[in-house]
């Protein structure tokens, strides 16, 4: 799966206030949806045991994947939209009757620093929903340990990819004078 995302090594601005040493072309993952079908099933099996009412996915990320998992599970799909002017803020559109009490899983294509899933979880909690899990095609770097510890929900990655990410202001590659890869 990682091969499909055409990985590149270097010094990258991840666009979330973080820098990292790995870039993945995540849009390339969705070029041939049938290749993801086994992974969608695997993610769905993990989330089914949480009896979710909905699956949420960040539109600038795993929304296509989240939609496929929601369809497989026969539950609602919630799109997380990036908030204008905020690097890491997301908002959900209004849902008739609200989502208070809904058990919701967040699904993303890849989790690195966790900013998108953290923002979606925060928005869900703010709306009264009960986040129960995060799932992703790929866990990058320390995300497999960080998500449960920092975000308080189980994390189900279909694969793990070695990489490193740092807050931009503490990036060792910047400190060493390594130019950002374009």
PLM regions and their residue ranges:
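PRPP-associated nucleotide enzymes
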Residues: 1-182
């Amino acid at each position: 799966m990682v091969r499909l995302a055409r990985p590149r090594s270097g010094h990258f601005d991840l666009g979330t206030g973080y820098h990292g040493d790995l870039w993945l072309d995540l849009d390339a993952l969705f070029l041939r949806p049938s290749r993801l079908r086994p992974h969608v099933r695997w993610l769905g099996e993990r989330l089914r045991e949480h009896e979710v009412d909905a699956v949420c996915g960040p539109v600038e990320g795993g929304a296509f994947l989240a939609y496929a998992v929601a369809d497989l599970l026969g539950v609602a799909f919630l799109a997380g939209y990036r908030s204008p002017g905020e690097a890491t803020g997301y908002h959900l559109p209004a849902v008739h009757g609200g989502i208070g009490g809904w058990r919701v899983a967040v699904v993303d294509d890849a989790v690195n620093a966790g900013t998108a899933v953290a923002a979606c979880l925060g928005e869900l909690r703010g709306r009264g929903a009960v986040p129960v899990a995060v799932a992703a095609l790929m866990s990058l770097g320390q995300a497999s340990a960080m998500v449960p510890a920092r975000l308080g929900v189980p994390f189900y990655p279909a694969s793990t990819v070695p990489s490193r990410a740092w807050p931009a202001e503490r990036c060792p590659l910047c400190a060493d004078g390594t130019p950002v890869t374009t």
